[in-house]
């Protein structure tokens, strides 16, 4: 999950950086797009919105900006359909959007790897959408998650983001270009509030359950929300032993969800206050209605 990097008192552990790759991409003839993690809202105060990031990224030289919360809507809808099938078949499943959790399953519970949802992560969903329109596009994910780097390097999922930057890495590039985040209104919104809340522990479950309601699936599965690595391990052990009473596990390797990621810019409690203020201003669009605005048929969610 990357927590060790910031916990090590000697600074002995580091992660691969894609800063040079991103800079070279910006200098190339290819179009380069930024995909911002849902956890971004609230990290830099109540006045720094997704609109603030969109403007800053344009000033740096990126060709486009999309909030990964839109990918959250896409993942929620796809995973809802997948879970309905699994529920009817009596199969237990675990979520696939947290790479730290996926790494844990594959490393420590390899016999349960087939329980991982086949639905791609929100980051990958947005990247595939962009590349369906422009196959030569370069996609860059920015967020508080170090494990996302392992998702793009190790998991080798077709159409996934090309590079991943932490907030500090992106801000270093911004600093070199003399660009700062400026206060902006909340008029820029591409995802439902459910997609935005993917970054919170329990947010994936809420979005998937909402999608089930919107598609009138007629089922109410029991979902175990594993908050942090310790809980993830505990519930995976129960599932392995056949003693998990729930139908699905939502696994978040970081406590609090992505907002508690190892490369977060701010304290999680401080971020929560700002984040709540921002999300209250989001409109109440539904997940499935929102996805009608995008060409979902042009790429696969699995």
Predicted features, each with a name:
Residues 15-302:
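Iron-sulfur-associated redox domains of electron-transfer enzymes in respiratory
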Residues 1-11, 253, 257-258:
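Cysteine-centered iron-sulfur cluster-binding motifs in ferredoxin-type domains/subunits
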């Amino acid at each position: 999950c990357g927590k060790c990097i910031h916990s090590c008192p000697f600074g002995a552990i580091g992660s691969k950086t894609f800063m040079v790759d991103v800079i070279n991409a910006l200098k190339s003839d290819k179009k380069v797009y930024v995909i911002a993690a849902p956890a971004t809202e609230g990290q830099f105060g109540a006045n720094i919105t997704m609109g603030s990031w969109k403007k800053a990224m344009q000033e740096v030289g990126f060709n486009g900006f999309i909030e990964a919360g839109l990918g959250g809507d896409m993942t929620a809808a796809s995973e809802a359909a997948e879970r309905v099938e699994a529920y009817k078949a009596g199969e237990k499943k675990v979520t696939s959007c947290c790479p730290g959790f996926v790494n844990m399953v594959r490393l420590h519970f390899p016999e349960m790897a087939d329980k991982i949802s086949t639905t791609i992560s929100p980051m990958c969903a947005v990247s595939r959408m962009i590349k369906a329109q422009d196959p030569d596009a370069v996609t860059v994910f920015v967020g508080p998650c170090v494990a996302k780097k392992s998702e793009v390097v190790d998991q080798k999922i077709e159409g996934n983001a090309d590079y991943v930057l932490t907030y500090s890495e992106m801000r270093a590039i911004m600093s070199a270009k003399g660009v700062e985040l400026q206060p902006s209104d909340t008029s820029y919104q591409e995802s439902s509030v459910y997609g935005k809340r993917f970054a919170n522990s329990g947010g994936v479950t809420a979005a998937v359950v909402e999608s089930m309601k919107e598609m009138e699936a007629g089922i109410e599965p029991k979902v175990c929300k594993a908050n942090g690595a310790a809980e993830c391990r505990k519930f995976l052990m129960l599932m392995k032993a056949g003693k998990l009473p729930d139908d699905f596990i939502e696994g978040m390797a970081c406590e609090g969800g992505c907002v508690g990621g190892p490369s977060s810019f701010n304290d999680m409690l401080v971020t929560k206050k700002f984040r709540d203020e921002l999300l209250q201003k989001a409109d109440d669009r539904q997940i499935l209605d929102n996805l009608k605005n995008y060409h979902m048929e042009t790429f696969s969610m699995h």
